[in-house]
């Protein structure tokens, strides 16, 4: 019996696009890109291929190309609600919030039952200072999809910011019911209990979490924060990485709702020092995050290096296109290994994850050249007497002004400290310290051990 011949056939264009979408969902982006390219060579006006090729470009950080492709797809198929919502996502990531809001509203006009568009609209309404409209948008998303975890989480965050803490806690409880091991919701619920003075309930959440995941850095750190027991001298690397990797995508949108001022306060302290762009300095942005501070100090820099522990944050910093290099490293190790490398070190809202500052300050002193400047922000431990530092229930450290002055002076630096409000949190201003310290020509050598 003769073996049967296998038969092959070429995929239709629709089948090819569906195959590319499957590759895209499986994170095989290069392979998907190759399929979209071939489809669009054969049919340049194929709406689905244009749209999903645009989404792929967005996934790969090419937002300009992404928007061009998505706009072409919508010109060909203007009544696609999903596509309008996706356009909003790309615009939002590009910082074009008003245009993104319009795109989400257009998606809802086409399909009033589009729960994700309602939720995404709520995020931007909150970010642009419209909490009443944001709440309505989140509740619309929940009404359409009673298991919409993101909408419940976002509504809880909004309500907490409006000091409606008990309502916020109810939202987080719902999220945990839907997804029992969702880290962010567990943390938010525990913080809500802390706000309500229910520290025992907060501790129970973290203790149960640790019983299930004994090595989880977030649960361990936050248990210490809400109980005051076994407080570490600084947040563990794992805590910082896990916190900011999960937070990176929404980081700037959230800060936009908090009147966040730390980078601007750092820049003002540089202007106060008389720095001018003509000086062309070698600058370290220590804990660069998504690059908010880097964008402000770039005019002073001949060379700007950003260092952070979070790959997610570094990816967003790369989009700012202001850094000469971005490095994933622990700050103390990096600065300590780069003697006399920088004229200026800035650190906005990063040293709040250090309690004991002696080691990191010693590393910064080594990394600074003579007459170099160190500028950073801290949260101010107001009303705690002459405390060195305190781990607060939200997981960040606050520091005493006297402690900071003594530490910098003993390190041979000349400090100037200004008190300022860093941002709003739960409806109240967060008191801060903006610190500038100059390294003299012959600074006192300091070791991390003191």
Region annotations inferred by a language model:
Residues 336-345:
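A short acidic, Gly/Pro-enriched loop at the edge of an enzyme's catalytic core
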Residues 17-25, 48-59, 82-93, 116-127, ...:
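Conserved alpha-helical positions within TPR/SEL1-like repeat arrays
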Residues 376-396:
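Short, glycine-/aromatic-enriched active-site segment of Class I SAM-dependent methyltransferases
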Residues 358-370:
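A short glycine-rich, Lys/Arg-flanked "PGG" loop and its adjoining helix->strand segment in the class I
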Residues 284, 288-334:
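Class I SAM-dependent methyltransferase SAM/SAH-binding core
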């Amino acid at each position: 019996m003769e073996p049967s011949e296998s038969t092959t056939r070429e995929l239709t264009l629709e089948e090819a696009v569906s195959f590319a979408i499957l590759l895209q969902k499986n994170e095989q982006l290069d392979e998907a890109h190759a399929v979209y390219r071939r489809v669009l060579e054969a049919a340049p006006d194929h709406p689905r291929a244009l749209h999903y090729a645009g989404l792929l470009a967005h996934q790969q950080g090419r937002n300009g190309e992404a928007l061009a492709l998505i706009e072409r797809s919508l010109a060909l198929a203007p009544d696609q609600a999903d596509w309008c919502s996706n356009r909003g996502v790309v615009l939002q990531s590009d910082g074009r919030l008003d245009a993104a809001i319009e795109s989400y509203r257009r998606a809802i006009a086409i399909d009033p039952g589009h729960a994700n568009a309602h939720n995404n609209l709520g995020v931007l309404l909150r970010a642009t200072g419209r909490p009443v409209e944001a709440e309505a948008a989140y509740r619309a998303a929940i009404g359409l999809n009673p298991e919409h975890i993101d909408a419940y989480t976002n509504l809880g965050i909004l309500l907490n910011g409006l000091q409606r803490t008990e309502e916020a806690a109810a939202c987080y409880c719902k999220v945990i019911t839907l997804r029992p091991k969702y880290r962010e919701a567990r943390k938010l619920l525990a913080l809500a209990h802390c706000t309500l003075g229910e520290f025992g309930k907060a501790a129970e959440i973290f203790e149960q979490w640790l019983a299930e995941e004994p090595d989880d850095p977030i649960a361990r750190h936050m248990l210490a924060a809400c109980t005051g027991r076994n407080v570490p001298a600084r947040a563990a690397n794992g805590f910082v990485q896990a916190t900011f990797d999960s937070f990176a995508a929404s980081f700037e949108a959230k800060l936009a709702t908090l009147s966040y001022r730390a980078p601007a306060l750092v820049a003002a302290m540089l202007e106060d020092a008389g720095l001018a762009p003509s000086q062309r300095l070698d600058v370290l942005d220590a804990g660069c995050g998504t690059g908010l501070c880097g964008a402000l100090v770039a005019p002073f820099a001949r060379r700007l290096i950003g260092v952070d522990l979070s790959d997610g944050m570094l990816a967003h910093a790369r989009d700012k296109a202001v850094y000469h290099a971005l490095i994933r490293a622990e700050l103390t190790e990096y600065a300590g290994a780069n003697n006399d490398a920088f004229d200026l070190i800035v650190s906005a809202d990063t040293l709040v994850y250090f309690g004991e500052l002696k080691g990191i300050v010693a590393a910064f002193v080594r990394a600074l050249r003579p007459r170099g400047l160190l500028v950073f922000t801290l949260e101010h431990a107001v009303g705690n007497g002459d405390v060195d530092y305190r781990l607060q229930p939200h997981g960040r450290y606050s520091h005493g002004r006297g402690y900071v002055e003594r530490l910098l002076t003993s390190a041979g630096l000349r400090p100037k400290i200004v008190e300022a409000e860093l941002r709003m949190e739960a409806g109240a201003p967060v008191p801060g310290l903006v610190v500038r310290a100059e390294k003299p020509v012959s600074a006192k050598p300091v070791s991390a051990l003191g």
